[in-house]
Amino acid sequence: MKTVMSGLDLRAIANELSRMVGSHCKKCYQPHYEQVVLRLRAKSGGNTDLVLIRGKRIYTSQRDRPMPQYPAPFAMVLRKVLTNARLKAVEQVGFDRVLRFVFENSHGAFHLYVEVFRDGNIILTDGEDMIIQPLTHATYADRTLKKGVQYSPPPAAQDPYDLDFDSFSQLMNSSDRSLGRTLGGVLNLGGGISGAICADTGNDADAEIKNVDLSKVWDSLQGMLHGEWKGYLFSGKDGYEQAWPMVLTT
């Protein structure tokens, strides 16, 4: 199972989940202390569970799952605010591993932020991003997540969609990391996609950037960013192990 999601994974997921815009939230559950399930009903009928696991992943499901007999406090807050609210938008925050789900009801707009990086959180805010309730209260060096304060995402990651070739080359040449680590970390692409770009361009992931033809890396990156995303499962000896928005060559 995929355990780490990159910024590009989240971009693909946001695009896919946009088909659910217009659905209404009918139920909110918290089957596990790190997991929230929103049961969404489409305009055409039929329910789909939106499964949110803080710090890990986001996916949809239609399988039956046991739910707690009594809702946890966070689930109760979600039910109070989001029951019968309409999903208006699914947005990635920059190129970060954060999705914003925009809901609307007769009282106005509400945002549900889902952070899928290490020590991430799930945060319910009003339409002005004032925190109504986080899944867990937390204080970091650069932000605080607690009721009554303004939500602020983590420091913004580099968005590769904002780069042209010149700025890309400058960013790469200023890095003291290897090619693979720069693509995966500085550009927030993750290990799998950065490894695929290295393989596609005939480079070792540990190669020094000064020895790399960056025009080939740029072309491969553009293919990843602007290619057709369908979603692919890759299996190993123990079953399905990874999911990617495109076929990776490694």
Model-derived features: where do they sit?
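Extended, highly charged segments
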Residues: M1-T250
